[in-house]
């Protein structure tokens, strides 16, 4: 772990260089479209570690865990929903090793793939409980902060922030994806 906390580093106005894409790198190492990327945290841990070490060697100051699809909802599509905590904890431990003593680990929370009521069938409480399972695994593995990536729905983002905040007081970074529509953005 770094001597200065991630929050302190950001408060001081320091630039924080993140790593690059994980999915494309895993594909270059043999991941197929039918494989679960997060399962590789257990079955191909050395491959994930090598990728993350390469990012550190290239100058990355923070490693993002291989958990973009690490919610029980996404993992369930591969038959791994019951291994949510295991896959997330393994990912955080791998990233922690790659980050070394002076790097940071960001626990990655991606979109759940669920559509919230009233437009879909998912309710906020179910979503929150699922994300909290992911968060607990990431905390067990030793993350320094969380990054919520490419969420399209403000309500899902709110639920994700609440789920993380219910389990931890670590910093939360967020990014959203917007689509251009005729009358602006969505």
Regions found by a protein language model. Give the residues of each.
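Domain-level signal for soluble alpha/beta catalytic cores
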Residues: 1-186
């Amino acid at each position: 772990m770094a001597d200065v906390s991630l929050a302190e580093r950001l408060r001081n106005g320091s630039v924080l260089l993140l790593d690059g894409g994980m999915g494309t790198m895993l594909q270059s190492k043999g991941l197929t479209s039918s494989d679960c990327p997060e399962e590789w945290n257990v079955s191909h841990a050395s491959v994930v570690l090598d990728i993350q070490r390469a990012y550190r060697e290239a100058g990355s100051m923070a490693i993002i865990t291989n958990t973009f699809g690490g919610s029980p909802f996404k993992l369930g599509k591969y038959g791994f929903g019951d291994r949510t905590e295991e896959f997330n904890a393994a990912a955080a431990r791998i990233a922690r090793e790659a980050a070394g003593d002076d790097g940071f680990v960001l626990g990655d929370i991606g979109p759940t793939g669920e559509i919230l009521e009233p437009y879909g069938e998912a309710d906020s409480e179910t979503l929150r409980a699922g994300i909290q399972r992911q968060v607990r695994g990431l905390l067990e593995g030793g993350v320094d902060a969380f990054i919520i990536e490419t969420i399209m729905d403000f309500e899902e983002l709110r639920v994700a922030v609440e789920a993380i905040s219910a389990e931890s007081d670590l910093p939360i970074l967020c990014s959203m994806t917007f689509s251009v529509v005729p009358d602006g953005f969505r």
